[in-house]
Amino acid sequence: MERKRFIDCDSTKILQELALNPLDLTAPGVLSAERIKKFSLLGGGFTFSFATERLDDAILAALISLAEERGLHESMLAMQQGQVVNYIEGFPSEMRPALHTATRAWVTDSSFTGEAEDIAVRSRVEAQRLKDFLTKVRSQFTTIVQIGIGGSELGPKALYRALRAYCPTDKHVHFISNIDPDNGAEVLDTIDCAKALVVVVSKSGTTIETAVNEAFFADYFAKKGLSFKDHFIAVTCEGSPMDDTGKYLEVFHLWESIGGRFSSTSMVGGVVLGFAYGFEVFLQLLQGASAMDQIALQPNARENLPMLSALISIWNRNFLGYPTEAVIPYSSGLEFFPAHLQQCCMESNGKSIVQDGRRVGFSTSPVIWGEPGTNGQHSFFQCLHQGTDIIPVEFIGFEKSQKGEDISFQGTTSSQKLFANMIAQAIALACGSENTNPNKNFDGNRPSSVLVSSQLNPYSLGELLSYYENKIVFQGFCWGINSFDQEGVSLGKALANRVLELLEGADASNFPEAASLLTLFNIKFR
């Protein structure tokens, strides 16, 4: 059945009308116990409160109707079953499924067929290979260095950091992404190369930043008299230039249908997490992620946490007109998580055409950013409360700390103070505070949602990762865009190569704009 475009949906028109007079969160009694209970949802181990969003029953009903008109449930089911979702009609495009969910489907009773089943089976095989590899070599190394960029660094780095306080380990972990040689040199200054394992991650096997950093490390190891094959392993697609067991100590695989920003539950994240914390920790992460994938298949948005959250974000973006969204985790372990979400959301949904090749005619991805609380309260929260731009916030919190070490100070523990601050911020943003002194007046009506679980551990981290991945995909399905390619990245790479040609002696007339900029900055290129 052919569906109406997002901009043409009946529900879109209703929501546009409702947006003219959204719920006033500052009105007396709005945040009642009844509303707080009603505007909440349980999803796996998480409780989601959206009582502090500017929506009511009518708006929520229209958003759910929008999900039905746009076929969000059917689209998610099609994606998880392996149908082609990465495409642009009538134009050359990747024409692939997006099967990151299959990389963890094998840990549950998920039953799929075709390519989804194939990727799930292959993922199980790779996981067993990883388990065997770690059993054999993990004790020989004290350090792992992961070389990769984009999804080969941001997701794995965020997950590793998130579990550092929960999972004791004697292993040291470093990530190298930037082509800036100082990035690699700083790490090499701190490690014992003889006890270091280097995992080189590139889906294509040709990523220039990764190749340069690999060469940088290989040269350093060689000067130390260390064999490349004894210390370097690869994670890449089957058949890529890096798929060479004659060169590497071991090669682990992912597949073309696994997008980089969605690849953390493949070997892209598995190798480093398994080395750092043990294979069982990685397995628990997969179990949590797969459980949330099942929730994402619920047809009713009121029972589907990532779908409902996606709809609320669309309400804020497309109908209330807010161009940015902050993700504020009240957990030090999640300090790198907003950066991962920034890539996952903005690279997926920062698109200006729908899948039939036409211009969208509406706003797509908001700018995603964030830092942990309470630190953020002492830096940018001033802007959230009294700035001229309204910035929706998604708070993430946990009932107890990871390590369980705490102190009672002035009648409450540190964990209680952390949680109290998060709740207070959501209420303050929503309700504001009137004051005759204009400098102390807070208008309120600044929307937020709050996502809470009992503790940040491998399983809940997997749930959280999957929640955001599925939320982002649901947004793309609703807008009708392709969330699984990244042509903007490709353009930048192509132009960078042309600049490099100038530095190698090419005629300046081949790229006069770049030549002029190089001249301005006194960069010699002839």
UniProtKB/Swiss-Prot annotation:
SUPFAM superfamilies: SIS domain (SSF53697). CDD domains: SIS_PGI_1, SIS_PGI_2. InterPro entries: G6P_Isomerase, G6P_Isomerase_C, Phosphoglucose_isomerase_CS, SIS_dom_sf, SIS_PGI_1, SIS_PGI_2. Keywords: Cytoplasm, Gluconeogenesis, Glycolysis, Isomerase. Signal peptide: none annotated. The active site is at E347, H378, K493. This is Glucose-6-phosphate isomerase. It comes from Chlamydia pneumoniae.
